[in-house]
Amino acid sequence: RDCLLSRGLGDVYKRQCQFAVAAAGQAITDAGLTMEQEDPYMVGCSVGSGIGSLQAMEREYDRLKEKGPGRVGPMLVPLMISNMAAGNVSIAYGLKGKSLNVVTACATGTHSIGEAYRTIQYGDADVMIAGGTESSITPIGIAGFSALTALSFSEDPERASIPFDKERNGFVMGEGSAIVVLEELEHAKRRGAKIYAELTGYGCSSDAYHITSPAEDGSGAATAMLNALKDGGVEPEELTYINAHGTSTHHNDLFETRAIKLAFGEHAYDLKINSTKSMVGHLLGAAGAVEFVTCVKEIQEGYIHRTVGLRETEEELDLNYCRDSYKEEVPYALTNSLGFGGHNASLLLKKYTE
């Protein structure tokens, strides 16, 4: 909020853009990135929002019904469309390189970071400001996901977002933004940047199966995971930890478990698997970015958080979903995101060593 007010933008941006601009400012400051010392055309932005601004749409639709089409605000479209998060981050910080808005539902944040990674790999940018943002806790947002039976109906908050538990019955919607500064390694080293971890692999696939359900056999998500490992030059047996999509819905947690077993075989039983959504809820298009940051910090601190609320699993959910937290070295972390429409994305991180 202070960041936005200092720029005079608090009343212009809708919430998903406010979150993104504020988070980007924090990331740029933390990275010690000084735009005056960079070629602005080599610093880009890849910030996605899965839905855009429902608030703007709801407000102007009410105005349409009450006062007619002539009273609809002229800024409805620019305030509503999902690419405004990336656009406003670029404007706020003078980023003149490639600017992307990836929209792949709940895989948006992960794809956004992955596409930023590819942009740097291809030499199209030295630095990318990347992540996701979302603000869909509105009447139509809650009603829509409730009608889809995706939200938890538990009256006990402690049992409302419990990924992989046999009593899971849906997710709790969250909102916010997570943004990171991705940088070509030699460029980061030359300017003495603080390096938290390395992003070394990115894998994607499409289920081509159903508009809301992941593929039942897990083949799509398994392919994305294996593609990320292959891209990073890591054998499946070298991985010890996965940050799962883990939405606390019946189908996702079951089918993602099948995907992990399909990708890793017997090694799946040696993996530690957790869900950050057990603590912060499901941030939709920002979820993958939040979970990416979680993995970065877990690698840095040598800590794997527990899956909160997990008490008892069902027969087929027989992997280690981290009922307890672990204090141990995390050499690699794989984070998964699965989006409506069958979009699958995985990112592989590794511990940075000089």
Predicted regions mapped to residue ranges:
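Single conserved hydrophobic/aromatic residue that forms the stacking wall/gate
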Residues: 1-13
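Active-site nucleophile and cofactor-binding loops and adjacent substrate-binding regions
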Residues: 14-17, 40, 74-83, 100-108, ...
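Short, well-ordered amphipathic alpha-helical segments that serve as non-catalytic structural scaffolds
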Residues: 20-31, 85, 112, 183-185, ...
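Active-site-proximal alpha-helical scaffold in enzymes
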Residues: 20-33, 82-85, 90-134, 172-193, ...
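Phosphate/pyrophosphate-binding loops at sites that engage ATP/ADP/AMP, CoA/4′-phosphopantetheine
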Residues: 27-39, 188-195, 225-241, 263-267
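Active-site-proximal gating segment of KS-fold condensing enzymes and close homologs
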Residues: 49-100, 142, 146-150, 252-266
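Active-site-adjacent elements of ketosynthase-type condensing enzymes
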Residues: 52-56, 135-161, 203-223, 247-262, ...
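Condensing-enzyme catalytic core mediating Claisen C-C bond formation in acyl metabolism
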Residues: 156-232, 241, 354
